[in-house]
Design a protein with these regions (language model features):
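Rossmann-like adenosine-cofactor binding region
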Residues: 61-65, 74-91, 187-261
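Glycine/serine-rich phosphate-binding loop and adjoining beta1-alpha1 elements at the start
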Residues: 2-3, 58-145, 256, 275
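N-terminal glycine-/charge-rich "phosphate-binding" loop or analogous flexible N-terminal tail
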Residues: 5-47
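NAD(P)-binding Rossmann-fold cofactor-contacting core
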Residues: 26-40, 168-188
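Residues at the starts of beta-strands that form the adenosine-phosphate
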Residues: 6, 29, 90, 148, ...
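Glycine-rich adenosine-cofactor-binding loop
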Residues: 8-18, 23, 145-165
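Residues in the short beta-alpha loop(s) of Rossmann-like NAD(P)-binding domains
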Residues: 13, 36, 97, 177-178, ...
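Rossmann-fold NAD(P)-binding glycine/threonine-rich loop
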Residues: 95-114, 234-280
Length: 286
């Protein structure tokens, strides 16, 4: 394989600008498209920019509607972009569905979902939790210290969030399906329950942070919440909250997407760049 020397960073949010900066600092020739940049590296023509790149880096997530690249201005249809790719190119995108990945590689190019890189997902927890705290602080008019919090799910993000809230003095209940996860939460100093018992406890919470990408906060729970309760749903699609039911019951429920790009885009972009460079090294592109 030829070493990658030319890269196109296309679409996304402020993370992609930081990603482009980090790849440039690593010695690569970087161009951008659709980021709203006013610099020498910003390409004016999409076709030319794609043709010159050995690798194209798409956003995280790559798309929301499976039709357009997220964040690109003007909008870029996925199928139009895919038609420009060459067989020898490497295409990288974040959170690719099987359908989108298949459409991107229809011309024979290689497609990699860089968000499957464990290094990136582990490091991405920190800016994600910072984003959760930022959202929470902007929405509440009381201190986290002494508040009653529920964290649904105890994966990487759920665990880091619960530990952080616990350290800030919140009374944290972790709701998780597995007994092992609940045991881990208890050893971390939190209370725990399973989802069957969540309706029994729901009325006591000041806010709920959901990290589970499956329906766990439905009408049975939402109708019991106190009027001031806040839900921050930070899970990926299809999310965990019945937002229509939340509206019916007058519950504030926010779908919080792309938190690292909002709370810490510089660090989040550097994390992506570092992970992508290591991925290229492992795959023989360096």
């Amino acid at each position: 394989m030829k070493p990658i020397q030319t890269v196109l960073v296309l679409g996304g949010d402020r993370r992609q600008q930081s990603l482009a900066d980090a790849l440039e600092a690593a010695g690569l020739a970087v161009r951008t498209f659709g980021l709203g940049e006013k610099s020498a590296r910003a390409a004016a023509d999409l076709e030319e920019a794609v043709a010159r790149a050995q690798a194209v880096v798409l956003p995280l997530p790559c798309t929301k509607d499976e039709t357009h690249i997220i964040g690109a201005a003007p909008q870029i249809p996925i199928d139009r972009l895919a038609a420009l790719f060459l067989p020898e190119q490497l295409i990288l995108g974040g959170m690719l569905t099987a359908s989108v990945a298949a459409r991107l590689q229809r011309g024979g190019c290689r497609v990699i979902d860089y968000y499957k890189c464990e290094e990136i997902t582990v490091r991405n927890v920190v800016p994600t939790v910072q984003g959760i705290l930022k959202q929470l602080f902007e929405q509440i008019d009381y201190t986290v210290f002494g508040s009653s919090a529920c964290v649904c799910g105890y994966g990487r993000v759920g665990r880091a969030t619960a530990r952080t809230l616990n350290a800030l003095g919140a009374q944290v209940t972790v709701c998780a399906r597995s007994g092992a996860a609940r045991a881990s939460a208890e050893t971390d100093g939190c209370a725990s329950c399973d989802f069957q018992r969540l309706p029994e406890k729901a009325a006591s919470f000041d806010y709920i942070i959901n990290t589970v990408p499956a329906p766990v906060l439905g009408a049975q729970v939402l109708r019991i919440l106190k009027p001031s309760c806040l839900i921050l749903d930070v899970a990926s699609a299809p999310y965990g909250t019945d937002f229509a039911a939340a509206e019916r019951y007058g519950v504030r429920a926010l779908q919080c997407a792309s938190l690292p790009g909002k709370a810490a885009p510089k660090t989040a972009g550097e994390i992506l760049a570092q992970g992508i460079l290591h991925l290229w090294e492992e795959e023989g592109y360096v």
